[in-house]
Each structure stands twice: as C-alpha cells, then as structure tokens.
C-alpha cells in the first residue's frame, strides 16, 4: 500500500471532557478504575484517549491511591 492510500485513524473522544471532569482526585476511585486494567496497570494514553497533561495527572493520582491502599498495585496475580 502506498502512503497516500493509508487511512487516518479516527481520533478517540476524550472521556474526561465528555464527562466534564476538570479535577482528577486520587480519592475518586470510580474514575481512576476506568484508567487501569483488570491487572491493575495504568492504561496507555492511546487506549484511553486522554491528553498528555491529563495522563500525567491520572498516573500521579493512581500512584497516590495505591499508596493509601485505595487501588491495588499491578501484580502477576496468583493462582
């Protein structure tokens, strides 16, 4: 395929702007769970569709929430 034939990917909608969320708080576990996988890892920006600045704030909030035991740390999962 030539470069001209490639289609541009559709830009993802920002879930934070859609929900009109301006403040990302580490105590808002319901919001933060949308941005972590079932294994407890922080989802990539290309998956969630948030901006660079929002991704940094989300990452910091998730780390703070893990520190105070509101969210689990990413682990291999036993069993």
UniProtKB/Swiss-Prot annotation:
One of its GO terms (molecular function) is small ribosomal subunit rRNA binding. InterPro entries: Ribosomal_bS18, Ribosomal_bS18_CS, Ribosomal_bS18_sf. Part of the 30S ribosomal subunit. Forms a tight heterodimer with protein bS6. Belongs to the bacterial ribosomal protein bS18 family. Transmembrane segments: none annotated. One of its GO terms (cellular component) is cytosolic small ribosomal subunit. GO terms for biological process: translation. Gene3D superfamilies: Ribosomal protein S18. It comes from the Bacteria. Keywords: Ribonucleoprotein, Ribosomal protein, RNA-binding, rRNA-binding. PROSITE patterns: RIBOSOMAL_S18 (PS00057). Binds as a heterodimer with protein bS6 to the central domain of the 16S rRNA, where it helps stabilize the platform of the 30S subunit. NCBIfam families: S18. This is Small ribosomal subunit protein bS18.
């Amino acid at each position: 395929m030539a470069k001209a034939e490639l289609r541009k990917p559709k830009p993802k909608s920002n879930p934070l702007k859609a929900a009109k969320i301006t403040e990302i708080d580490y105590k808002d576990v319901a919001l933060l769970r949308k941005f972590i996988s079932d294994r407890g890892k922080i989802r990539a920006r290309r998956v969630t569709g948030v901006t660079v600045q929002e991704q940094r704030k989300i990452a910091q909030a998730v780390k703070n929430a893990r520190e105070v035991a509101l969210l689990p740390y990413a682990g291999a999962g036993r069993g």
